[in-house]
């Protein structure tokens, strides 16, 4: 969570006293707060936007945070995990990623659904990428493009980063 209040009110003054809060999801819809000391996420000032990308290609989400009247702040994820990123390029063979759905099926019959959207941030756009916290025990991955076409990813070739460049 990044504080997102850039309009000061006369009676309260500027709203840039927070330092932000990292929340970790457990896959069931519940989130656990991580202290700033543990996460290293300390955004001083009036943070206005947060975009997520895999900037160093390790399969983990990295943050780029916009600060009102300040410089961008970059946070490279240092946690060592068995994660996976799936990147959908903007225009693979004429297809657009906005609205694409990605289903991740596990061997225990559980399913994760991800949908790529555009917008939702203040003058910012995250990369067309999803992150899967644990790539072990994945049975299959299906991508449904906005035009209805579906692709199945061969899970035998899972690495830390997958791109659908030629689909």
Q: What is each residue range found by the language model?
A:
Residues 3-167:
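Gly/Ser/Thr/Pro-enriched helix-cap/hinge segments flanking short amphipathic alpha-helices
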